[in-house]
Regions:
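Solenoid-like repeat scaffolds
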Residues: 43-48, 78-86, 114-121, 146-153, ...
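Alpha-helical linker/edge segments of TPR/alpha-solenoid repeat scaffolds
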Residues: 51, 68, 99-109, 136-144, ...
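Residue-level signal for cytosolic alpha-helical hairpin/rod architecture
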Residues: 53-57, 126, 176
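Soluble C-terminal extramembrane regulatory/interaction domains of multi-pass membrane proteins
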Residues: 157-203
Length: 246
């Protein structure tokens, strides 16, 4: 990352100048100064880059909302050179391209980008798991869900998607255990309580509470009232926020 390298260079230069000038506490203070200057430089450069890319993100968001999916993907791909400068930006761009491609039915492109999405891009990890599951690569699907849960432990939906896959494959006990893990994260969550009860009573999981966040994964056909929705790829923002608990 250029931002990190430049910040280190600025910090090292500051520390070296301090030491060579023989100022207070010479090299010891030079090291401290170098670290501090590097940190400040990193923050300032990162903020400058964020301000530079924000207008592009806003323009892309308008394209997504206007249904111009292919144009939005092209614009996101054009932003890839900027990932050399901004930490975490690459994973965010891959996540958004992957989600847009998956929602539009371009599974080849979706698979390529979803696999490279940042670990905290929960929706992208869920879409990647769903894609792998639909293609019969169930071990890879569970691996993607494991990553999503480790990186976003307080988000409930990954546990439910995992439980759905386990139950679908006939492993009801493992599905119950996965939702018990979710219950430990948030004991009052109604979705978890309902689905635990359904599993223990031999019923199918009810994923409707998750809305298009669930149906956008294309693991179940959405009811008629959801089909007019935009799907998960049209959601605002590039960094995923936890769902509101009911």
């Amino acid at each position: 990352m250029y931002t990190i390298l430049i910040s280190i260079l600025i910090g090292a230069t500051s520390g070296a100048i301090w030491t060579l000038l023989g100022l207070w506490k010479t090299w010891q203070m030079g090291i401290v100064l170098g670290v501090l200057v590097s940190g400040v430089s990193f923050v300032l450069i990162s903020r400058w880059m964020a301000k530079r890319v924000e207008p592009q993100f806003m323009a892309i968001q308008k394209q997504i909302q206007g249904g111009q999916t292919q144009l939005a993907i092209a614009q996101l791909e054009d932003m890839m050179p900027l990932t050399r400068w901004q930490v975490l930006l690459k994973g965010q761009i891959h996540a958004q391209i992957g989600l847009l491609a998956y929602a539009s039915g371009d599974e080849k492109r979706a698979e390529e980008h979803l696999a490279k999405a940042g670990i905290r891009a929960t929706e992208a990890k869920l879409a990647h798991a769903a894609l792998e599951y639909r293609k019969g690569r169930k071990d890879k699907a569970r691996e993607a869900l494991d990553i999503a849960i480790r990186a976003n432990k307080k988000q409930i939906m990954p546990y439910h998607v995992y439980a759905w896959m386990l139950a679908k494959d006939g492993d009801r006990d493992a599905a119950i255990n996965k939702l018990v893990e979710a219950e430990k994260v948030e004991s009052s969550n109604e979705s978890t309580q309902e689905n635990l009860s359904r599993l223990r009573n031999g019923k199918k999981l009810n994923m409707k509470r998750f809305g298009m966040g669930w149906f956008g994964l294309q693991l179940e056909k959405p009811p008629a009232q959801y089909r007019a929705g935009q799907g998960m790829a049209g959601r605002k923002g590039f960094r995923q926020k936890p769902q509101r608990r009911r």
